[in-house]
């Protein structure tokens, strides 16, 4: 049994990222689970080794420890390919503009792929494949879903039902890449992760991931989607809000003060270290409301 934190190494972690990481660590450690670290670096254009090292150093500085070696998704491509071959899939030749225009149809739910390429005849596929090849582009690979919704359980929100469409498993374009939904399901199963603590901006992904896990024969983990940190304007905190990364905050405050701010955002005052917070952490008292930075 294990929890995990899985950042994408595209820059320094900000206060909201650090808070979610702390919560993932607290939930796992307080329940006697292993805590694993995974670097989600499948977006090779945005990811960097330097960002990964910086993120891991920040988490360690805050007192978060993990079990075993860090797993890098960039080493797992063979596993994703093996999983893909087990699934019912089809090629998608749509551009982003194609999907946006098709999604404006009144019968299509926002954010749901309308299935444009699902029923194409083979001769149509050959033609569209050739058109993309002439542009040095590859088709995407989509799951041929057999349901339009799927049930899952969230520890903070109870029973949930979310939309499922023919979502992308392998991104197309000039540089194809593995999609988040496939990679995260395969890696959670591989690592034995049975508890996923993450921001509630990813709640909409849970139904797709739980459904995909069912197709691959892996049980869904316990989902715990925690409230985000928002800025003063009620928008999700971002690095552009200024002085929100650990390095920036350390300019004006010592590390124990920054940790105290993180603990305070969870409702614990006067706590200056991860071990101290772990001793008193009570998941039942976690606020369901976002924290305003």
UniProtKB/Swiss-Prot annotation:
Enzymatic class: ligase
Binding, Zn(2+): 92, 94, 113, 117
GO MF term set: ATP binding; glutamate-tRNA ligase activity; zinc ion binding
Segments forming a coiled coil: none
Keywords, sorted A to Z: Aminoacyl-tRNA synthetase, ATP-binding, Ligase, Metal-binding, Nucleotide-binding, Zinc
Cofactor binding note of this UniProt entry: Binds 1 zinc ion per subunit.
Domain of life: Bacteria
Sequence motif 'HIGH' region, location on chain: 7-17
Enzyme Commission code: 6.1.1.-
Cofactors (names): Zn(2+)
Short motif ('KMSKS' region): ranges: 236-240
GO CC aspect terms: cytosol
Binding positions (ATP): 239
Binding-site residues for L-glutamate, renumbered to this chain: 4-8, 40, 180, 198
InterPro entries assigned to the protein according to its UniProt record, in alphabetical order: Glu-Q_tRNA(Asp)_Synthase, Glu/Gln-tRNA-synth, Glu/Gln-tRNA-synth_Ib_cat-dom, GluQ/Sye, Rossmann-like_a/b/a_fold
GO terms classed as biological process: glutamyl-tRNA aminoacylation; tRNA modification
Family: Belongs to the class-I aminoacyl-tRNA synthetase family. GluQ subfamily.
Protein's job: Catalyzes the tRNA-independent activation of glutamate in presence of ATP and the subsequent transfer of glutamate onto a tRNA(Asp). Glutamate is transferred on the 2-amino-5-(4,5-dihydroxy-2-cyclopenten-1-yl) moiety of the queuosine in the wobble position of the QUC anticodon.
Name of protein: Glutamyl-Q tRNA(Asp) synthetase
Species whose genome carries this gene: Corynebacterium glutamicum (strain ATCC 13032 / DSM 20300 / JCM 1318 / BCRC 11384 / CCUG 27702 / LMG 3730 / NBRC 12168 / NCIMB 10025 / NRRL B-2784 / 534)
Gene encoding the protein: gluQ
